[in-house]
Regions:
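A short beta-strand-loop-beta hairpin characteristic of the jelly-roll/cupin
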Residues: 59, 77-97
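Non-heme Fe(II)/2-oxoglutarate
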Residues: 1-39
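Short beta-strand His + acidic residue motifs that chelate non-heme Fe in jelly-roll/DSBH
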Residues: 60, 84-86, 103-104, 108-115
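Short connector loops at helix/strand junctions that flank enzyme active sites
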Residues: 41-43, 52-54, 69-73, 79-81
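Phosphate-end processing signature that detects enzymes handling 5′-triphosphorylated RNA
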Residues: 93-112, 126
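A short hydrophobic beta-strand segment most commonly corresponding to one strand
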Residues: 72-77, 100-102, 117-133
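Fe(II)/2-oxoglutarate
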Residues: 139-186
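Conserved short histidine dyad/triad with adjacent acidic residue
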Residues: 48-67
Length: 186
């Protein structure tokens, strides 16, 4: 459910042209509205995101979600469980309910809910500005050049990986051999 979205639609999850506005759903959550309004600058997309038990979100990049780029993505876990596996660039992230976390989602990341209960996070995207940057430790602010170099390696690896996977899938289909339906994620 979107609390802030393009055009104020609580069901519109995409970044669309136009102004990001609060949705009617946010009227039901004044405490969350106070959290969102407490950050300097303009919020873009803000969502309550749920991952059901046994659901996967496979490796992907959110290209503009970095302190070095256009938007900063902040997470506040609301409900989680010990079966959740979340990685950013193969680094395990264990985020507990009520904590505020920044992740550089321009790096590859994935998650899996291996537990028996849903995982719910308040996920907030804010346009990068100097006041927001000032909230981050100096080491994170100063690491932009290093992150760009590492991010390029990740992007190059993604290109190679896709070529190998697509080539393998083509060969497998030519031989009419079916690949396995599941692969272990973690």
């Amino acid at each position: 459910v979107c609390l802030v979205s393009s055009g104020g639609d609580p069901y519109e999850d995409r970044y669309l042209d136009g102004v990001f506005t609060k949705t009617p759903a946010l009227n039901l959550a004044p405490y969350m509205e106070g959290i969102i309004d407490g950050f300097p600058g303009r919020s873009s997309r803000v969502r309550l995101m749920q991952l059901r038990p046994r659901e996967n979100v496979f490796w992907h990049f959110d290209g503009w979600q970095s302190l070095d780029k256009r938007y900063v993505r902040l997470h506040i876990p609301i409900v989680t469980n010990s079966g959740v596996r979340f990685q950013i660039s193969h680094e395990d992230c264990r985020w507990r309910p009520g904590e505020l976390w920044y992740g550089d989602f321009a790096f590859p990341h994935r998650l899996y809910n291996g537990g028996d209960s849903p995982r719910v996070h308040l996920v907030m995207d804010f346009a990068v500005n100097n006041d927001l940057k000032a909230l981050f430790p100096r080491a994170i602010q100063d690491g932009a050049k290093t992150r760009r170099k590492i991010r390029k390696l990740c992007t190059d690896s993604k290109v190679v990986y896709r070529k190998v996977v697509y080539r393998t899938v083509q060969v497998v289909h030519r031989q009419t051999v079916q690949p396995p339906l599941t692969w272990p994620l973690f």
